[in-house]
Amino acid sequence: SELPGIVAAYGQAARNAIAAGFDGVEIHGANGYLLEQFLQSRSNKRTDAYGGSIENRARLMLEATRAAVDAIGADRVGIRLSPYGRANDSGEDDPMPLYTYVIGELNKLGLAYLHLIEPRASGAGQREVDHQDVPSGCETVRPLWRGTLITSGNFRTDSA
């Protein structure tokens, strides 16, 4: 399996970023990229320890994030999530059970911040019609997340 090497690469990439003079790293668990593909039930059809249950689907994201934290410290690691994203065939019909679990586990790591893509924005900056009436990440996730929360995506004067 390639997964242990992928997890190790997150730690090495974090070390490389610090060595190159960056202040920290953001783990990209959004927009249909690898970590989100494992996380979301629409894209993850695995039947091993990385598929099926919420805990299993979250495993790769949590392992990769822990590898970065172990490499450079939690205060230098943030993570970006898109609970309502649909990029690359990812997504959840009801994302809150999954993200309640993921955010609870991420809280334990003491990360620098959590960066959310708003439900009303897609990866292409267009409105996600399916989620246009879902409250802001500030309303849905703030009660779950203990640290710094950043939200982005399709803000307008009436929603900012």
Where are these regions (language model features)?
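Flavin-dependent oxidoreductase catalytic cores
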Residues: S1-A160
